[in-house]
Amino acid sequence: VELTGEEKAAVLALWDKVDEDKVGGEALGRLLVVYPWTQRFFDSFGDLSTAAAVMGNPKVKAHGKKVLHSFGDGVHHLDDLKVTFAQLSELHCDKLHVDPENFRLLGNVLVVVLAQQFGKAFTPELQAAYQKVVAGVANALAHKYH
């Protein structure tokens, strides 16, 4: 990811304030509500029939937490995202057959959730830096696709 030193510092400073457990469930839940076709990868999660069911689903929250912990690993390894996400890329490509476009969608949803959580502290400059980060993570996750 091409970030200036200032952008990296700002991304890391904000990330240290992120409640990964809460934000992860919120971001994944929103993805599943706004882009309902992504639900097909989560058949084992039970009731995803309404927005309220999705947002209150404990399996969605648990998986969102896991996703955001992995994203946090990426935030701390911005210069080596392909290596950081190599195993997850392989898993999502070869075993789960997830459309890599879903990584971009989730990244964009995450930026919205961060903006909601941090309000005015999530400046336009910080948003631009996070857009670069989520794009880099999405590209790293799509790396193993043929």
Swiss-Prot record:
Q: Which residues carry this modification: N6-succinyllysine?
A: K17, K59
| Record key words, sorted | Acetylation, Heme, Iron, Metal-binding, Methylation, Oxygen transport, Phosphoprotein, Transport
Pfam families the UniProt entry points to:
Globin
Q: Which GO terms describe its molecular function?
A: haptoglobin binding; heme binding; hemoglobin alpha binding; metal ion binding; organic acid binding; oxygen binding; oxygen carrier activity; peroxidase activity
Q: Name one GO biological process term.
A: hydrogen peroxide catabolic process
Chain ranges of the Globin domain: 2-146
Please indicate which superkingdom the organism of origin belongs to: Eukaryota
Residue numbers carrying Asymmetric dimethylarginine: R104
Residues found modified as N-acetylvaline: V1
Tissue specificity remark = Red blood cells.
- Where are the Phosphoserine modifications? S44
Q: In the UniProt record, which is one GO cellular component term?
A: blood microparticle
Q: Mark the residues carrying the PTM Phosphothreonine.
A: T123
Positions with a binding annotation for heme b: H63, H92
Q: Which family does it belong to?
A: Belongs to the globin family.
Q: What interactions and quaternary structure are annotated?
A: Heterotetramer of two alpha chains and two beta chains.
Q: What does this protein's UniProt record list under function?
A: Involved in oxygen transport from the lung to the various peripheral tissues.
According to UniProt, the name of this protein is: Hemoglobin subunit beta-1
The species is Tapirus terrestris
Q: What is the lineage of its organism?
A: Eukaryota, Metazoa, Chordata, Craniata, Vertebrata
Q: Which gene encodes it?
A: HBB1
